[in-house]
Amino acid sequence: MVKSTPMLYAADLACLKGDRLLFRGLSLHVAPGAMLRIAGPNGFGKTSLLRILCGLAHPEAGEIRWNGRPIAGDRESFHRTLLYLGHAPALNDLLTPLENLRFACAAAGDDVDEDACVDALVRIGLADQLDLPARVLSQGQRRRVGLARLFLGIRRSLWVLDEPFTALDAAAVADLATTLSDHCAAGGVVILTTHQDAPFAVPPTVLDLSEVAA
């Protein structure tokens, strides 16, 4: 899909969910600075593919390489280069957004100070919810807590995002699109699913799973 040397390479992937084969023979390469959008109807395996590319799920067949090395050989090192945000962020309902964000960063080994976390949460639209317990947040607000990690300048080369624009207003969509574009401009890689159009600096390459479905 990209002609320059790939950072992420996958060959002949197959995905089985229950007794249903979602896709097979799926190959892709993503070069430094590229953004890849995974498209396709619901039920075609978009989230499953993201989890496979992150090493969080095993493919039925095929191989994934990061910078030329199979991720299966050293998942721990691979995960240190990865920032994955699923569609349902795991939050502790007893903690505030700020506490949840700081906990997530610490768990991932990222050293981020409190002021930076506050700034990120304000930027994503949670200024009025900083001190509220997560249990009272809406689903959209819960997602924003997870997305705030993208505004912290964390040095992770590969960002994998499942529907990051859901429940964001137009200003937040534009701000997030700029952040993703900036990450790619700095040589990072973004792989995402989204049903929304976003004002990216460069339109992403699209992989449509309906074209490779089993």
Curated annotation (Swiss-Prot):
It comes from the Bacteria. One of its GO terms (molecular function) is ATP binding. Transmembrane segments: none annotated. Residues 8-212 form the ABC transporter domain. ATP binds at G40, P41, N42, G43, F44, G45, K46, T47. One of its GO terms (biological process) is cytochrome complex assembly. The keyword Transmembrane does not apply. Its EC number is 7.6.2.5. This is Cytochrome c biogenesis ATP-binding export protein CcmA. It comes from Aromatoleum aromaticum (strain DSM 19018 / LMG 30748 / EbN1) (Azoarcus sp. (strain EbN1)).
